[in-house]
């Protein structure tokens, strides 16, 4: 090594060597200028790899390193370019495709308004408020209305209905008493023959990733909201190319000054990239990816497209396990109104929450949220977007958020029915409901009233009876269409647990009695409301040798030993009901239950069935009473109206159809008698409170007061309420004091409609005397009768006893006991009676 190092400079006698070295080096730099030296170099070659550190080697080493660095830079640039192509493809594949798995939006019912329909001005105000319209003194935007002496003016929101998209409309609704007289388009003074309200968004069916959002295009966001967002989060948004060097420098300076991270430098584009493509990991690699992808996204897409994506993606809170994503859904979640209807202070609150939705949550931390909102307003004032006067006014306002869950709430009971129907109607299509719009029969007014009845009524009953575990279920259905309007599954309506309305299979007690009387009244030649039924002690021997002796609730009997059919049902008497049912035959009564819509597998033809020994859910009971209340037309209960795919394709459309199940005349007579129950029978307390509504109803109490029921019917709905305990222990309540009290609270929270019955063909009102005989004029009472010739009835010479086909014909001595042989004979064909004695029921 030492010899080699010294050898080149030790040859002092040969001056040409340095020249040759110089020429050789210059040749590499420029071969064309030094061709004359080729032969000379070939004769005496010089080693190219010297290991010495002579002065002549240094320039070549620097250039070698530069060349190496250049090659590395080229390779790095190529890799960066290739990686950029990969990132660009990744961005495009999502942004140009399906950006999100949108949740399914579930809407309530669409209310159709027509001139001359029965609805008062006050009812209309309630309906508008339940649909999130706001009463104001002067209308300026959709979703607002004003109230005058006999009219309501409103600006209906634009909405994409299942059959067509309709814009906003200024309309005037004029009322005449309890009727809607006219509907006028205020823009052209033309009258509407048909006008529909946009439905209320009630809840969402989450996407698999647990995110909830409503997509709104850029054009749907108010410009002032965009200005507020940019003023707060990225004021140079329209100038930078995805990353802001100015913001980075400002953040570095602020963080160095503070000695910690106090300010970020991410643009809206970077935030969007992070939310859509990256994790929240704190690393330089993630930040580098974020910046690179932001540059690519900014180059690839317009600023408005980036804003559109950001404003639909940003995280703005939590609803249980689901994330609230985007300003459109957050505006409904916190304020109960669409994003285009937000006031500036409300917009400022949502923009302020972008920095930290949990920290500035207006429900959890209202003070911090207020400070943050006012800071955003101050930024607007400093940037001269608003003036000082407007800032002072807006900053003085309260937060103005609605109660938690006021608009979008889980509605677990109702949604269980919706999901069940979706599965039945759509089959495998139900697996992908992304972006689907589901239109239901949900009535916000009825649901709010039912929830309030449960939340207020059950604690009152708990306190009254000193019980801590009382529960309830409420089902409200349309009287004619069978559409389910409301459903409450327990004393905590929004608790997603045991849905008693659909799952609690309980004995129904005296709610079973109308089916027996309906069976009888379907035979007009034999049974009428003035038919006498035996009311005396009876004993039925069963195949196992046991004797069943049903009793009336008060353990007393009629002095005459008989009672009119109408009074037996009105007073909910046990013994006459059993006598009547056994005379009709258990198979006939069972067949009536099937016609009413009760599942056949829940029916067991044993005598105790006549007093309620059948276990049904509240929604199954609602189906049975809907059939009676509609005049004998059974309409299958349903919560689903239509399902519209994201592309507008109709996946399902319901066409409610009712079918004749029982004779209209028999249903009318039964319903009329149920009106007597409320007027003067076991539900008279309800009738006293609402004397002008002519409500129909039926109480029900099971043995030992374990279950209490009430079926209430007004002019438009059938409502079933149940009160009991999950452990099947006594409630110390009767149907009238338990379930009916919940129904009373339900009525108090909304506006029931009168039940004005219209008799069908061949129904005539006729007078009867004290003995139940028809009279041609006057009479002790007036009863409706199913007959095509009422005059012939009152002209008959002998009216002292019922028609010859009546098995309860009495002799002139009314105390004569009815024959028990038919009832006992009926038991010869009965089986499955083991255990029904313990399921015997009371009368109310």
From Swiss-Prot:
Example GO BP: positive regulation of bipolar cell growth
Basic and acidic residues compositional bias, start-end: 1-10
Native organism: Escherichia coli (strain K12)
Pfam name, any one: PBP1_TM
Quaternary state and interactors: Forms a trimeric complex with MipA and MltA. Has also been shown to exist as monomer or homodimer; homodimer of Alpha and Gamma isozymes can be found. Interacts with UvrA, FtsL and FtsN.
Ranges facing Cytoplasmic side: 1-63
Pathway: Cell wall biogenesis; peptidoglycan biosynthesis
Name the record gives this protein: Penicillin-binding protein 1B
Positions of region (Membrane association): 88-250
Keyword Glycoprotein: no
General remark: A third isozyme, Beta, lacking the first 25 N-terminal amino acids of the isoform Alpha and a fourth isozyme, Delta, have been found, but seem to result from the artifactual degradation of the isoform Alpha and isoform Gamma respectively.
Region (Transglycosylase): 195-367
GO molecular function: penicillin binding; peptidoglycan glycosyltransferase activity; serine-type D-Ala-D-Ala carboxypeptidase activity
Consequence when changing residue 233 to Q: Loss of wild-type glycan chain elongation activity. No complementation in strain defective in PBP-1b
Residue stretches of biased makeup (Basic residues): 11-25, 48-60
Acidic residues composition bias: residue spans: 30-44
């Amino acid at each position: 090594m030492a010899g080699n190092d010294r050898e080149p400079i030790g040859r002092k006698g040969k001056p040409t060597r340095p020249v040759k070295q110089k020429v050789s080096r210059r040749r590499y730099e420029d071969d064309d200028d030094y061709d004359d030296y080729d032969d000379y170099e070939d004769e005496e070659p010089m080693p190219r790899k010297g290991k010495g550190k002579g002065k002549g080697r240094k320039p070549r080493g620097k250039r070698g390193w530069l060349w190496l660095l250049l090659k590395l830079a080229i390779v790095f640039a190529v890799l960066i370019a290739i990686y950029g192509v990969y990132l660009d493809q990744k961005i495009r594949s999502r942004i140009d495709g399906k950006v999100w798995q949108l949740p399914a939006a579930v809407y309530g019912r669409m209310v159709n308004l027509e001139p001359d329909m029965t609805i008062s001005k006050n009812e209309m105000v309630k309906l508008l408020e339940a649909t999130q319209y706001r009463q104001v003194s002067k209308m300026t935007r959709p979703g607002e209305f004003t109230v005058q002496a006999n009219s309501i003016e409103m600006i209906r929101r634009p909405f994409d209905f299942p059959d067509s998209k309709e814009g906003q409309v200024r309309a005037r609704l004029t009322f005449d008493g309890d009727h809607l007289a006219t509907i006028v388009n205020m823009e052209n003074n033309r009258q509407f023959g048909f006008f529909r309200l946009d439905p209320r968004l009630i809840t969402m069916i989450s996407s698999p990733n647990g995110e909830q959002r409503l997509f709104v295009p850029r054009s749907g966001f108010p410009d002032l909201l965009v200005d507020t967002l940019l003023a707060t989060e990225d004021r140079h948004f329209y100038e930078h190319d995805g990353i802001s060097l100015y913001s980075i420098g400002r953040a570095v300076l602020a963080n160095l000054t503070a000695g910690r991270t106090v300010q970020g430098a991410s643009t809206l584009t970077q935030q969007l990239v992070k939310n859509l493509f990256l994790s929240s990991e704190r690393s330089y690699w993630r930040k580098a990816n974020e910046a690179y992808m932001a540059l690519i996204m900014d180059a690839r897409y317009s600023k408005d497209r980036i804003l559109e994506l950001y404003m639909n993606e940003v995280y703005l809170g939590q609803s249980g396990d689901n994330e609230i994503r985007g300003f459109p859904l957050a505006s409904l979640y916190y304020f109960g109104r669409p994003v285009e209807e937000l006031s500036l202070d409300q917009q400022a609150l949502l923009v302020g929450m972008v920095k930290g939705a949990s920290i500035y949550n207006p429900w959890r931390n209202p003070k911090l949220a207020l400070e943050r909102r006012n800071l955003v307003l101050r930024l607007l004032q400093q940037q001269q977007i608003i003036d000082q006067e407007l800032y002072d006014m807006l900053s003085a306002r309260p937060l103005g958020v609605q109660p938690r869950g006021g608009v979008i709430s889980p509605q677990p009971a109702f949604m269980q029915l919706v999901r069940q129907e979706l599965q039945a109607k759509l089959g495998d299509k139900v697996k992908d409901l992304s972006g689907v719009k589901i239109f239901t029969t949900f009535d916000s007014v009825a649901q709010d009233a039912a929830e309030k009845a449960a939340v207020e009524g059950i604690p009152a009953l708990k306190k009254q009876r000193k019980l801590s575990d009382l529960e309830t279920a409420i089902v409200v259905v349309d009287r004619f269409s069978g559409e389910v309007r409301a459903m409450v599954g327990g004393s905590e309506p929004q608790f997603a647990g045991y849905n008693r309305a659909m799952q609690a299979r309980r004995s129904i007690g005296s709610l079973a009695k109308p089916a027996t009387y309906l069976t009888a009244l379907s035979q007009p030649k034999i049974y009428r409301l003035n038919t006498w039924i035996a009311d005396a002690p009876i004993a039925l021997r069963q195949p196992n040798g046991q004797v069943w002796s049903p009793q009336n609730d008060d353990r007393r009997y009629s002095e005459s030993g008989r009672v009119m059919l109408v009074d037996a049902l009105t007073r909910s008497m046990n013994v006459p009901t059993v006598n009547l049912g056994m005379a009709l035959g258990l198979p006939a009564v069972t067949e009536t239950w099937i016609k009413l819509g009760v599942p056949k597998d829940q029916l067991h033809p044993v005598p105790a069935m006549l007093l309620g020994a059948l276990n049904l859910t509240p929604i199954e009971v609602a189906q049975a009473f809907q059939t009676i209340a509609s005049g004998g037309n059974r309409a299958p209960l349903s919560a689903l109206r239509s399902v519209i795919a994201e592309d507008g394709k109709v996946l399902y459309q319901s066409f409610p159809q009712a079918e004749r199940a029982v004779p209209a005349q028999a249903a009318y007579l039964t319903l009329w008698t149920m009106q007597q129950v409320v007027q003067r029978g076991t539900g008279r307390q309800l009738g006293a409170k609402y004397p002008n509504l002519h409500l129909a109803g039926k109480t029900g109490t099971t043995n030992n007061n374990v279950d209490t029921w009430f079926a209430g019917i007004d002019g438009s709905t059938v409502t079933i309420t149940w009160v009991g305990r999950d452990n099947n222990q006594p409630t110390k309540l009767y149907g009238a004091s338990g379930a009916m009290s919940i129904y009373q609270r339900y009525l108090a929270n909304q506006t029931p409609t009168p039940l004005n019955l219209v008799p069908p063909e061949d129904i005539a009102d006729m007078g009867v005397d004290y003995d139940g005989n028809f009279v041609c004029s006057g009479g002790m009472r007036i009863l409706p009768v199913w007959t095509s010739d009422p005059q012939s009835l009152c002209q008959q010479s002998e009216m002292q006893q019922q028609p010859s086909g009546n098995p309860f014909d009495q002799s002139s001595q009314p105390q004569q006991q009815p024959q028990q042989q038919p009832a006992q004979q009926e038991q010869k064909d009965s089986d499955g009676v083991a255990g029904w004695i313990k399921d015997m029921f009371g009368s109310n």
